[in-house]
């Protein structure tokens, strides 16, 4: 990359970032937080945050990168995708109505508490089983890729660890105090550190816990944008340190700076992977929607499907094995746009942008239902569901459409199953006479009795 080429890329980069940041800032000032703001920030992080790191690696350390024309193509396609996405998100599909509708879901106090207990039980039980089978893998494995080897049993259990976070989200949304907010951080980060040590380097639970803590703080006005920036810097440094421990690296001096640059870029902003796909575009055999179906294979236990393929050719594995010819055992993220390119080439990019806009709109609709519901238990469940799905939005931007679809379906099934079981348990307990009504009197300022006033309203709660 020459200085002239860098200058041209920088102009395109600046225009793209200003365009996306302007739209995101307007939305932030309007609503402070919604899933459009979240997706936009994650999109900026994935496709634009890594450009400065790439430039420093090129000019400071002489690292060879993808030819400039493909880097430019990656930037332009990312910006075009966001423009189509934004139009799709903002397009109203039906007229807004103020007519109240009958609630599709009702949740009481007992059901809400049973739901978070079941979610937490799933997470803790699967962590316990994984630990009994494998011990502390962080101190046993020589490389991170060994996690996926036959020596490690119960790898599928890792997918259940995450449900501890939605459980703690329900607890927080039932109270929504600063104390509950801080306890959420302490509990989820402690659990994330435990899973990091047991699994041998999986940082996802830690990243999500910290990110959700920050998002809740922004929504409630407990942290400012400057505090968010400081927390982001702290998070980047923390993730770099954990990556060093994961890969067993001992670095110092210039090499430490070099390692920081490429690990941080690859962790938060694998945008060069999209450029690699454009470079190898003529070699790609478009997979259609097959990667989405194949990604569900990993959720089917081998005892249920004895002939299940051990190697799943989703978009990440296709990119890693067929495009990069990399068989190290780790799948390399193709990004959201990369997965669309693998599935259907250029034509799938605008179609994917429209679909993503509708998905984000749906999450915002559910989130608004939760915020505005008068039943605080139902509101807590809906908001916890939406915030719990943040991990799936991260998967969408970083890993791709196929990984997102399989994980969001899995998340909805487990969350919905826990709520259904909670309702069934409540019905059984109530039928057995173990649920009693708690009468709570609303204290009001004494007023002179009038024919139209009602003294001491009574509210019933199940305990």
UniProtKB/Swiss-Prot annotation:
Membrane topology, record value: Multi-pass membrane protein
TM regions (residue ranges): 6-26, 39-59, 65-85, 112-132, 154-174, 180-200, 201-221, 222-242, 340-360, 377-397, 408-428
Listed pathway(s): Bacterial outer membrane biogenesis; enterobacterial common antigen biosynthesis
GO biological process, one term: enterobacterial common antigen biosynthetic process
Pfam families in the cross-refs: WzyE (PF06899)
Source taxon at top rank: Bacteria
Presence of keyword Magnesium: no
Entry's family note: Belongs to the WzyE family.
Function according to Swiss-Prot or TrEMBL: Probably involved in the polymerization of enterobacterial common antigen (ECA) trisaccharide repeat units.
UniProt cross-references to HAMAP family, sorted A to Z: WzyE
Name of the protein described by the UniProt record: Probable ECA polymerase
Organism lineage string: Bacteria, Pseudomonadati, Pseudomonadota, Gammaproteobacteria, Enterobacterales
């Amino acid at each position: 990359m020459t200085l002239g080429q860098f200058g041209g890329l920088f102009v395109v980069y600046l225009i793209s970032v200003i365009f996306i940041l302007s739209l995101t800032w307007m939305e932030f000032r309007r609503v402070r937080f919604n899933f459009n703001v979240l997706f936009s920030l994650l999109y900026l992080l994935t496709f634009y945050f890594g450009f400065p790191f790439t430039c420093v690696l090129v000019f400071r350390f002489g690292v060879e990168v993808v030819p400039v024309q493909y880097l430019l193509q990656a930037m332009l396609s990312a910006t075009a995708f966001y423009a189509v996405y934004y139009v799709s998100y903002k397009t109203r599909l039906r007229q807004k109505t103020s007519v109240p509708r009958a609630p599709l879901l009702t949740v009481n106090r007992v059901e809400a508490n049973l739901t978070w207990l079941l979610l937490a039980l799933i997470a803790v039980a699967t962590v316990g089983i994984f630990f009994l089978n494998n011990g502390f893998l962080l101190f046993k494995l020589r490389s991170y890729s060994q996690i996926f080897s036959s020596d490690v049993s119960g790898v599928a259990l890792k997918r259940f660890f995450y449900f501890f976070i939605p459980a703690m989200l329900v607890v927080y949304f039932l109270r929504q105090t600063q104390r509950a907010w801080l306890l959420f951080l302490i509990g989820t980060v402690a659990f994330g550190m435990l899973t990091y040590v047991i699994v041998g380097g999986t940082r996802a639970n830690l990243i999500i816990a910290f990110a959700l803590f920050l998002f809740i703080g922004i929504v409630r006005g407990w942290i400012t944008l400057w505090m968010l920036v400081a927390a982001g810097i702290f998070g980047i440094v923390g993730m770099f340190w954990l990556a060093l421990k994961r890969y067993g690296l001992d670095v110092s001096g210039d090499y430490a700076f070099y390692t920081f640059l490429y690990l941080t870029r690859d962790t938060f902003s694998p945008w060069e992977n999209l450029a690699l796909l454009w470079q190898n575009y003529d070699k790609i055999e478009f997979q259609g929607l097959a990667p989405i179906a194949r990604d569900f294979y990993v959720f089917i236990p081998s005892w249920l499907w004895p002939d299940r393929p051990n190697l799943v050719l989703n978009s990440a594995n296709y990119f890693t094995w067929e495009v990069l010819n990399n068989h190290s055992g780790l799948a390399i993220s193709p990004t959201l746009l990369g997965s669309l390119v693998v599935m259907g080439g250029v034509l799938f990019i605008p179609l994917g942008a429209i679909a993503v806009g509708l998905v984000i709109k749906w999450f915002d609709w559910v989130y608004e239902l939760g915020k505005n519901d008068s039943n605080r238990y139902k509101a807590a469940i809906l908001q916890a569901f939406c915030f719990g799905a943040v991990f799936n939005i991260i998967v969408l931007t970083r890993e791709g459409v196929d990984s997102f679809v399989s994980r969001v379906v899995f998340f909805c099934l487990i969350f919905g199953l826990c709520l259904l079981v909670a309702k069934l348990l409540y019905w059984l307990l109530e039928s057995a006479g173990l649920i009693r009504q708690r009468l709570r009197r609303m204290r009001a300022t004494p007023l002179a009795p009038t024919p139209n006033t009602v003294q001491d309203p009574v509210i019933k709660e199940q305990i």
